[in-house]
């Protein structure tokens, strides 16, 4: 086929239309169809697959605990700088389950109790065993004294007397215990004394949920034992059937619509989900909000950049605790703002746990440099200690996540106390825990078709742009080249002239005088050929001779 026979104008129109159709399909129609399908499936509708996974997470989460072993307790008692060693991880499986579920179709809500169950994994903990002996701050002693000194100082003598009776002899703020006793099995506490101070102290510890009964005369204290396999509270959340943006959002906790731990309304709100689910269709500007009853606060992860997980493109989110002194909106978390705010990179957990405890990232990563200077033995590493989520914005799927939180004691001297009067004023790390999960191929393959559609959609879009643009421009150029005839303009030949000067003649007319000077006309020799009609025969061809009488006037 000859190019002259091709209708390049039609080809250009077809290419332009193909580009428009391709862009419309890839940027509007196909994405909307996918979103419609996701809206139908990403709802906590009774009997749905998502609902079953939400009620009981079908795999165990990784729960790892690291404990800071105090190597110089006696020096600390005299005001010295602590030296610590990170011992761990001690590995547990964490199973999350929701039960006693009630649905309300009118409100589009579900109400349930939630429990966490931890199972020790010695195979993954090895070479550690959980039987290691470690030295840590004894929260039942120094934690109680610090809390009473801060909030109810008038009761300090009574509490001190009760502690002297229960822990006789009371000689240190630290205790050496077996790891598993500290974490789950429990440290025995003798509450058999009939002394009023001792009975009042044991009764107070029991009512606060700090200890569990061991027998008629003893109770036991541990970090996680009381919460293992028991309800952490009753939640009411949105199911997301009517509005998918509300999926999993916490409405009430233990029938309360807000907390009462803080002075400001903003800090007492439940913001976000219970961290086991997140809504879909988020953007990079949105935060991943989750509220936790263990810390009585909402934490929001922020977008930090693009990432990938097992070949899937994801968005990387992290959490920065920041500095409340520079955040007036959330200074309601401070005891006495702005000077009473916790150090940069920490959050005050005292109102929630009833003890002077600060939360932070492990090894004070991202915190005030003074926190690191006050303790020997800390080695912050972003890969090991930062909080992260590899997240898919469209489906709300966390492919891989690690929530890491360190618990620290706000240490200070106990005023007027012989044993604890020389303690340094500083933030002492006690332990840190990591709760995390990473989807294996069993779960990621279920999302693969969706990502294949995304790749296909992106391919259609860019092919439409590239081929449509090149085809339109190329066809338009060929149409112009073949069908738009150029106009040939003949160059005009310019008349060439030669000018000669004629010497004037002198005449006396018989008077002996020269006549007045006359201006003689120039004789122009014209050499012209092929002149246009305007010149050829127009002016030059029709020039009449000048009469002699008129020449005299020159």
From Swiss-Prot:
Pfam families referenced in this protein's UniProt entry, alphabetically: CD36
Membrane-protein topology: Multi-pass membrane protein
Spans annotated as Disordered: 498-554
Cytoplasmic-facing ranges: 1-10, 479-554
UniProt keyword annotations, A-Z: Cell membrane, Disulfide bond, Glycoprotein, Membrane, Olfaction, Receptor, Sensory transduction, Transmembrane, Transmembrane helix
GO molecular function terms attached to this record: scavenger receptor activity
InterPro entries: CD36_fam
Biased composition range(s): Basic and acidic residues: 514-528
A GO biological process held by the record: sensory perception of smell
Membrane spanning stretches: 11-31, 458-478
Extracellular side: 32-457
Glycosylated sites: 69, 215, 228, 440, 457
Cellular-component GO terms for this entry: cytoplasm; plasma membrane
Compartment(s): Cell membrane
Superkingdom to which the source organism belongs: Eukaryota
Residue ranges the record marks as coiled coil: none
UniProt main location, coarse: membrane
Disulfide bonds: 267-332, 296-352, 334-341
Signal peptide boundaries: none
Protein role: Plays an olfactory role that is not restricted to pheromone sensitivity.
Family statement drawn from the similarity comment of this UniProt entry: Belongs to the CD36 family.
Name of the protein: Sensory neuron membrane protein 1
Native source organism of the sequence: Culex quinquefasciatus (Southern house mosquito)
């Amino acid at each position: 086929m000859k190019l002259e026979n091709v209708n390049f104008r039609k080809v250009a129109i077809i290419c332009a239309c193909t580009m428009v159709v391709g862009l419309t399909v890839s940027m509007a129609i196909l994405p909307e169809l996918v979103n419609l399908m996701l809206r139908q499936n990403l709802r906590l509708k009774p009997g749905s697959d998502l609902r079953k996974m939400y009620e009981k997470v079908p795999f165990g989460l990784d729960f790892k605990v690291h404990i800071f072993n105090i190597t110089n307790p006696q020096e600390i008692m005299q005001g010295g700088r602590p030296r610590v060693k990170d011992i761990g991880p001690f590995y547990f499986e964490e199973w999350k389950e929701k039960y006693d579920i009630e649905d309300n179709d009118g409100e589009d809500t579900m109400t349930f109790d939630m429990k966490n169950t931890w199972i020790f994994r010695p195979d993954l903990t090895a070479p550690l065993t959980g039987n290691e002996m470690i030295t840590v701050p004894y929260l039942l002693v120094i934690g109680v004294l610090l809390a009473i000194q801060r909030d109810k100082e008038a009761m300090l003598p009574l509490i001190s007397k009760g502690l002297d009776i229960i822990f006789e002899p009371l000689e240190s703020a630290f205790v050496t215990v077996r790891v598993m006793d500290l974490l789950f099995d429990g440290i025995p506490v003798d509450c058999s004394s009939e002394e009023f101070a001792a009975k009042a102290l044991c009764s107070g510890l029991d009512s606060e949920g700090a200890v569990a009964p061991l027998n008629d005369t003893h109770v036991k204290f541990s970090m996680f034992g009381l919460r293992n396999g028991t309800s952490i509270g009753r939640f009411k959340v949105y199911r997301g059937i009517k509005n998918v943006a509300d999926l999993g959002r916490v409405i009430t906790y233990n029938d309360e619509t807000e907390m009462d731990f803080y002075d400001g309304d903003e800090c007492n709100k439940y913001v976000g989900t219970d961290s086991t689910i997140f809504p879909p269709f988020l953007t990079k500007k949105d935060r991943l909000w989750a509220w936790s009853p263990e810390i009585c606060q909402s934490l929001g992860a922020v977008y930090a950049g693009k990432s990938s997980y097992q070949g899937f493109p994801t968005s990387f989110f992290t959490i920065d605790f920041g500095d409340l002194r520079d955040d007036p909106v959330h200074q309601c978390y401070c005891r006495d703002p702005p000077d009473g705010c916790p150090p940069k990179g920490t959050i005050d957990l005292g109102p929630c746990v009833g003890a002077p405890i600060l939360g932070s990232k492990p090894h004070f990563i991202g915190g005030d440099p003074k926190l690191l200077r006050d303790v020997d033995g800390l080695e912050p590493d972003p890969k090991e200690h930062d909080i992260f989520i590899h997240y898919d914005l469209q489906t709300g799927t966390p492919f891989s996540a690690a929530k890491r939180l360190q618990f620290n004691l706000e240490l200070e001297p106990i005023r007027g106390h012989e044993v604890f009067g020389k303690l340094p004023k500083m933030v002492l790390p006690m332990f840190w825990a990591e709760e995390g999960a990473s989807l294996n191929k069993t779960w990621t393959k279920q999302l693969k078709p969706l990502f294949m559609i995304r790749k296909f959609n992106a391919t259609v879009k860019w092919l439409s742009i590239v081929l449509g643009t090149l085809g339109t421009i190329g066809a338009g150029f060929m149409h112009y080249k073949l069908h738009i005839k150029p106009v040939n303009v003949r160059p005009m030949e310019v008349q060439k002239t030669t000018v000669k000067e004629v010497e004037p003649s002198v005449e006396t007319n018989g008077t002996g005088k020269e006549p007045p000077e006359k201006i003689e006309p120039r004789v122009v020799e014209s050499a012209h050929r092929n002149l246009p009609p305007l010149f050829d025969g127009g002016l030059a061809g029709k020039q009449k001779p000048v009469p002699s009488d008129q020449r005299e006037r020159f």
